Amino acid sequence: MKKYLSVILAAALALSLLSGCAGSKPTETTSPDQVEGTVEELLNEIVAQQPVEFDGGVETIDLTDTSEEGQWAIKSSTGLDNAGVLTEAAVFEPMIGSIAFSMVMVRVAPGEDIKSVAEAMKSGINPRKWVCVEADDMLVTGYRDVVMLIMLDTSYDLTAQSFVDTFGKVVGEPEFVI
């Protein structure tokens, strides 16, 4: 009787172990239409792969700041008048203001048209936002829910296209470049 009970318990234990280790699919934490990682992380990775020859830093853009200063920060960084089309934004710029370089990355809110947001960014940004210098090369690209606007002064031996190429390696192959 003890052997019979031991065999039944052993079989039950084996079945429970096998069913517990069965191949279940992991739960997806992001939608297939979303790029993984924060825009700050993505910007830092782009700069790590496409280095610049100046000290710069990534700053998060507060999309909830409705003050005049907050709205100016959103407009001068993204070119957008309406931050409601975004869920997050960050910018990489030089620590010295006399270098014309700005790389901004935004995550577009669900339901918004990513290409329309990109076009609004390009038409709304001021390439002369610095006092004495101007960006003469600008591109906007996007993949899934992320848009990157890069503008720079080519006298620093940089091109916007090189950053778009790096965007493709870090974020995903661009769906458009404008």
Give the location of each predicted region:
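Positively charged n-region of N-terminal signal peptides that target proteins for export
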Residues: M1-Y4, A11
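C-terminal motif of bacterial Sec signal peptides marking the signal peptidase cleavage site
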Residues: S16-G20
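Bacterial signal peptide processing site
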Residues: A22-K25
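Surface-exposed, low-hydrophobicity interaction/linker segments
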Residues: V35-P94, I114, A118
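A short, solvent-exposed beta-edge/loop patch
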Residues: M95, R107, C132-F176
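A short acidic-to-branched-hydrophobic micro-motif
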Residues: I99-P110
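Short amphipathic alpha-helices in soluble, non-transmembrane regions
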Residues: V117-G124, S162-G168
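An anionic, turn-rich surface loop/hairpin at beta-sheet edges
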Residues: A118-L139
